[in-house]
């Protein structure tokens, strides 16, 4: 669990990281490479005294192909995924953003709505006393309800946040217990 001061600092870090990534998005344009976009994101985070301990970027077709897309020379044309784990004062927050030039595809809209549903189910289930295994099952059931049964097997579903990118990760046998004062 985190102290009240740590929770306040974590919230501030989350807000500042989101703003920095937003500024990076304003500064990039189609045609740039994933590497150039990653550099811009790291630059904006550094301006806010944050370090990106994880920087992932995928453009267009690479989004569907890689769960942890290390930036390449691939150039952005329409759709972009940006991911960071931003660190300041020892604490780490994780965030992802999708950017589209023009109207997003119907498929992307559907996947975004489904991901939001899964996230809402997890937020609702993340209460003191819940186990990581219960949260994993909640996510698996929510994916299935949205027509994405088995999607949970393609990537970890996250877990408690704090001084590591994940203090623990939810999985089917996860015995970790959600405690008051933890961040997710």
Stretch-by-stretch model annotation:
Residues 1-184:
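Active-site neighborhoods and metal-handling regions in enzymes and metal-associated proteins
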């Amino acid at each position: 669990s985190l102290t009240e001061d740590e929770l306040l600092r974590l919230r501030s870090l989350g807000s500042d990281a989101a703003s920095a990534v937003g500024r990076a998005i304003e500064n990039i344009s189609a045609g740039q490479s994933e590497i150039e976009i990653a550099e811009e994101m790291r630059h904006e985070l550094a301006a806010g005294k944050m370090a990106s301990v994880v920087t992932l970027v995928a453009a267009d077709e690479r989004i569907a192909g890689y769960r942890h897309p290390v930036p390449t020379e691939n150039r952005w044309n329409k759709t972009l995924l940006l991911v960071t784990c931003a660190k300041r004062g020892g604490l780490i927050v994780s965030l992802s953003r999708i950017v589209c030039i023009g109207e997003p595809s119907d498929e992307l809209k559907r996947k975004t709505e489904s991901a939001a549903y899964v996230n809402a189910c997890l937020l609702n289930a993340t209460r003191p006393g819940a186990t990581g295994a219960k949260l994993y099952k909640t996510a698996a059931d929510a994916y299935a309800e949205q027509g994405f049964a088995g999607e949970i097997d393609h990537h970890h579903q996250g877990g408690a946040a704090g001084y590591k990118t994940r203090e623990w990760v939810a999985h089917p046998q996860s015995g970790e217990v959600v405690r008051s004062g933890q961040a997710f």
